[in-house]
A protein has these predicted regions:
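N-terminal Rossmann NAD(P)H-binding glycine-rich loop of SDR-like oxidoreductase domains
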Residues: 4-24
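SDR active-site strand-loop-helix element
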Residues: 7, 31, 68-72, 108-114
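NAD(P)H-binding glycine-rich loop region in Rossmannoid oxidoreductase-like domains
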Residues: 45, 49-91, 99, 119
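Active-site Tyr-X1-5-Lys
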Residues: 137-163
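Conserved cofactor-binding/catalytic machinery of classical short-chain dehydrogenase/reductase
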Residues: 54, 91-95, 107, 147-148
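Conserved Rossmann-fold NAD(P)-dependent oxidoreductase catalytic core, especially the SDR/UDP-sugar
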Residues: 95-141, 163
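Residues forming the Rossmann-fold NAD(P)(H) cofactor-binding site
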Residues: 14-16, 90, 146
Length: 164
């Protein structure tokens, strides 16, 4: 049975994904970050305490994992939280990628955001080949998602099989 790890499992995308993976006969492991299990209460999931911003907490979680679905993110548009946004979205993604690569994970699926892409000029279609946000004065969340995507691409070049 394929073991899938979901980061951000208590969020909307993660909680929805849990149900779909269980329906497809995956064994599902979740990072228990905040003890909030309401999103998947009563479901057959393996919970292991951890925090993507603390790399040392991830090694045990990644043992025997076949595929990682990285949905975790700190979604906030308030510039006052720029350091926290960057720590979770960029540094956390780097930790997930690094541990996945070194643990022999076969595949990682990274959940990015439309906000990672430069939306200007506004009247053009926003396609996935659009340039990533690179303006240091951009909304911190947008820049963090763009930089997280760059991290994933960097690890793809190091040998981690990824989809974004």
């Amino acid at each position: 049975m394929t073991l899938a790890l979901i980061t951000g499992s208590s969020g909307h995308a993660g909680a929805t994904l849990i149900r779909e993976l269980i329906n497809q006969n995956y064994k599902v492991r979740c990072i228990d970050f905040d003890n909030d299990h309401r999103a998947y209460e009563g479901l057959d999931v393996d919970l292991i305490e951890g925090d993507i911003t603390k790399k040392d907490s991830l090694w045990k979680i990644f043992e025997d994992v076949d595929v990682v679905f990285h949905t975790a993110a700190f979604i906030c548009l308030d510039r006052r939280y720029k350091d926290l946004i960057r720590n979770v979205n960029v540094n956390g993604t780097r930790n997930v990628c690094d541990v996945a690569l070194k643990s022999g994970v076969k595949k990682m699926i990274h959940f990015s955001s439309v906000d990672a892409f430069n939306r200007f000029p506004i009247d053009e279609p926003l396609l996935e080949d659009k340039e990533l946000v690179n303006d240091k004065n951009a909304i911190p969340y947008d820049l963090s998602k763009a930089d997280a995507q760059r991290v994933v691409l960097e690890y793809c070049n190091k040998g981690l099989e990824t989809s974004i």
